[in-house]
Amino acid sequence: MPLPKIGNLAPAFSLQNQQGDKVSLKDFKGKKNVVIYFYPKASTPGCTVQACGIRDSSAAFKMLNTVVLGISPDPIKRLQNFIDKQALNFDLLSDEDHSIADKYGAWGPKKFMGKEYDGILRSTFIVGKDGKLKAIMDKVKTKSHHDDVIDWIKVNL
């Protein structure tokens, strides 16, 4: 499957959020910019830092007419627990079979403690109101992720 390219339409998806409601990329076309960020696992240290940075920057994202969607292979119940525990104010989507991560090139080989396995490659995709992919960030730093994304949107959208 070809990886998404900047300037092309972002790969479509429809996934369940933490409450079991379907959220589709097309829901935002013509209305809002969309930040899609793939993260490995809810309630782990790096993912918590990243999510809380986004939570704390919600006013900036709102001012930029941008919605943030986090996607992981976690089941819905784990997503809801993560939202409750961290008071997150944006949707997390469940991609248990990693089919959407595959479409975005966000699933692949990783190494941890000397072992190689397949998993989520922490990455972010910025989609404009026109539904086209505007940016791909694949070298994500969890502590500054929210600021990096906001700065990019301010300059480019």
Predicted segments with their positions:
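Chalcogenol-based redox active-site neighborhoods
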Residues: 1-157
